[in-house]
Design a protein with these regions (language model features):
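Conserved catalytic core of nucleotide polymerization and phosphodiester-bond processing enzymes
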Residues: 1-184
Length: 184
């Protein structure tokens, strides 16, 4: 993507430096994910699976990154590409090879974990109310008019509680209701 900017190159570099200094944990996570890419790309019979995180939710192994629900984030054909002036990791995608780096892995992991959390919440919500639609991180349910307050409270309670494997994760929810999705 290209963005028009009136900032000088020096100012842009300064802003990047400030971001990296203030958000050192983010940068460290990017580096851990770069290392995971390296390990997955060079996996051999002597390699040992290991957890990417302190909570033992994300297992780096030959197959990719194993998520808490047992599914994997997999980068088929992952390799270190040295064909251009700047080397990079690439993997086979639908339309050829796509480059990837630690920050991209973080984005993929965050999106996958968010989807797992919402999916688990939907299973719990389904015990009392019928989810009929999801939009990003929103769950749309149907409830009787005289049960809207109870339904809202139940759904907020469920969606504001992190799963056991993510204890301490700040999750929150707000609820709206109307006669149709467009009214919310």
């Amino acid at each position: 993507m290209l963005f028009r900017s009136d900032l000088s190159d020096n100012e842009c570099q300064r802003l990047v430096k400030v971001y990296r200094e203030v958000n050192d944990k983010v940068i460290a996570l990017w580096k851990k994910c770069d290392e995971a890419l390296q390990n997955m790309a060079s996996w051999n019979e002597n390699s040992q699976p290991y957890y990417l995180d302190a909570h033992n939710c994300l297992l780096v192994c030959k197959e990719g990154i194993k998520l808490p629900n047992g599914l994997y984030i997999y980068y088929p054909g992952l390799t270190w590409d040295t064909s251009e002036s700047k080397s990079k990791f690439v993997y086979k995608a639908r339309n050829g090879f796509t480059s990837i780096w630690g920050g991209s892995v973080v984005e993929n992991v965050v999106q996958a974990l968010a989807r797992i959390i919402v999916g688990e919440q939907m299973v719990k919500i389904n015990e009392k109310y019928k989810p009929v639609l999801t939009v990003h991180d929103a769950v749309v349910c149907v409830a009787q008019d005289d049960d809207v307050d109870n339904a809202s409270k139940f759904i907020i309670d469920i969606m504001s509680t992190p799963p056991q494997w993510a204890a301490g994760l700040p999750v929150a929810c707000e609820a709206k209701y109307g006669d149709s999705y467009g009214d919310c």
